[in-house]
A protein has these predicted regions:
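Conserved nucleotide-sensing/catalytic segment adjacent to the nucleotide-binding pocket
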Residues: 2-63
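Conserved NTP phosphate-binding and transfer environment spanning the P-loop NTPase/kinase superfamily
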Residues: 52-131
Length: 131
């Protein structure tokens, strides 16, 4: 579901909870280069948007430099970012034309959720191979 496109407002609620939302003026809107401004709620229905959501993962997309060694391939090295005094997991993901960025981001979010529930597939794999 879309919460915000380019501009995300983040508020700290209580000690450890961050909430992300969108400024009213651009709520439900995304810019799609070559097409223009789209209203996601009107195009895809109310089930495709949400007013706010807890922020527990930051995904940084960067152009892939072609060097395989410059990115964590197993998922064992965790990076964090400070947002309003809260430590939030940061995933830096290399992208290039042809990659399904939506699927990659969804996979990162699901993996993050799985880790919070106590399941770390990367660590399980490392244990299997004795790393």
């Amino acid at each position: 579901r879309l919460i915000a496109d380019d501009a995300v407002e983040i508020k700290r609620i209580a000690d450890r909870r961050l909430i992300g939302s969108c400024p009213e003026i651009i709520r439900y809107l995304i810019e799609l280069r070559g097409i223009g401004i789209l209203n996601v709620k009107e195009l895809f229905g109310v089930g495709s948007v949400k007013e706010q959501k807890t922020v527990d993962l930051v995904i940084k997309l960067e152009v892939w430099d072609g060097k395989a060694d410059s990115y964590d391939r197993l998922g064992l090295n965790e990076e964090y970012m400070d947002i309003l005094g809260n430590k939030v997991q940061l995933n830096t993901i290399p992208v290039r034309p042809g990659r399904n960025v939506a699927m990659i981001c969804e996979s990162a979010a699901m993996t993050n959720r799985q880790k919070k529930m106590g399941k770390n597939t990367a660590q399980d794999f490392a244990n299997r191979i004795g790393k």
